[in-house]
From Swiss-Prot:
Belongs to the ATP phosphoribosyltransferase family. Short subfamily. Pfam families: HisG. Coiled coil: none annotated. This is ATP phosphoribosyltransferase.
């Protein structure tokens, strides 16, 4: 049985739709289930529903053979997993944002984010020294209350930035969800996993 870890929410919904297009027989009530572990005996699959950051942990430690994770998580975590396929779902991007017309001041201006590794790498590559402040939610609040000069966050439609009076200043990277695999699982179940990859690849919408 293949075990696949997936994040709850938008990625889960789009991934389930993709699996169905690839002719995987998932039950109609699959999306409505409140279970965190769902077995689909007909396809010899088990699904684990988790928080996005935890999906990569489950795959790295072999609790799940495969996982679906956003490229933003993979960039931030840098875990020991293989990236097999760009699923082209949950499209968004990582960006630097802030209040319009406000310049970064001081020797090491502050940047708030839940992606400290991504932010540190980006500003270092830009030749800018910054102080990173890690937050876990409501990142847009940081410039409004004077906690930070800039934020680094995921942007989808830009609506949240606009509603909080912020503007996108720099685009860091495009983000889509990826199919990842545990290296040991790939060696042991390579043939089965490759069949899954081929079926998904055949139905992925091209950008």
């Amino acid at each position: 049985m293949l075990t696949i870890a997936m994040p709850k929410g938008r990625i889960f919904e789009e991934a389930v739709e993709l699996l169905r297009r690839a002719d995987y027989m998932l039950p109609p009530e699959f999306e409505e289930s409140r279970k965190l572990v769902i077995d689909v005996a007909e396809e010899n699959m088990r699904f684990i529903l988790a928080k996005p950051m935890d999906v990569v942990t489950y795959v790295e430690h072999g609790v799940a053979d495969l996982g679906i994770a956003g490229k933003d998580v993979l960039m931030e975590e840098e875990r020991n997993v293989y990236e097999l396929l760009d699923l082209q779902i949950s499209r968004c991007h990582l960006a630097v944002a802030g209040l319009p017309g406000v310049k970064m001041n001081g020797i090491a201006p502050r940047v708030a984010t839940k992606y400290p590794n991504v932010a540190s790498t980006y500003f270092r590559e830009q030749g800018e020294q910054v102080e990173i402040i890690r937050l876990n939610g409501s990142i847009e609040l940081a410039p409004l209350i004077g906690l930070a000069d800039r934020i680094v966050d995921i942007v989808s439609t830009g609506r949240t930035l606009k509603e909080n009076g912020l503007v996108e200043l720099e685009r860091i990277a495009d983000v889509t969800s990826r199919l990842i695999v545990n290296p040991a699982s790939y060696r042991l179940n390579g043939e089965v996993i490759e069949r899954l990859v081929d079926r998904l690849a055949a139905v992925i919408p091209q950008p």
